[in-house]
Amino acid sequence: MSSSGSKVFPTFRVVIVYEDFRTAAQAKRAYDFLAANLTHEWQLTSQMWKFELLRIPELRDMAAEDAAMANLIIVSCHGDQELPADVTDWVEMWQGDKGEPVALVALFDRPPEQAQHARTTQAYLERVAKRGRMEFFTWPEGLPELEILVPDRASVTAAEPLCQAA
């Protein structure tokens, strides 16, 4: 409880990086689904970054800071080309700075077998997740049940003062 008597919920942070409007809309639908189904014991926040913005070093740094604090990171793309170097540079910036990550999601707008570079992107992000001891999921092949993505309430009790300060 806060000093005003209202209950303070821990923050569940989502960072979305996306290729274009279509992939942003797809990621937003996934976020909205999460928001609609996430237990009401969490305050859900999101940051969205377009691939193009990661070309600018200062913005890439800001996006990396956001990702380092995130519980869930979604990379939304078509998969018809390799991830741009600016995006992989961004991934390498935050992946070593993760505290207690929950999940990394590769979100494609078509099945990976229908996109020339989706499997390469998927494999790269899966390696990143493994190095960072994160859960890894890909879509449209199937996301897990929602409760897998949400940290155990007891595991964040100690972090609640940090969540409140953020």
Question: Which role fits each region the language model picked out?
Answer:
Residues 59-62:
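Short acidic active-site motifs
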Residues 16-18, 49-50, 73-78, 104-109:
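Conserved beta-strand segments of the P-loop GTPase G domain that flank and frequently precede/overlap
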Residues 128-166:
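Glycine-rich, aromatic-bearing surface loops/beta-hairpins
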Residues 21-23, 53-56, 75-84, 110-115:
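Short acidic, S/G/P-rich loop/turn micro-motifs used as interaction or catalytic elements
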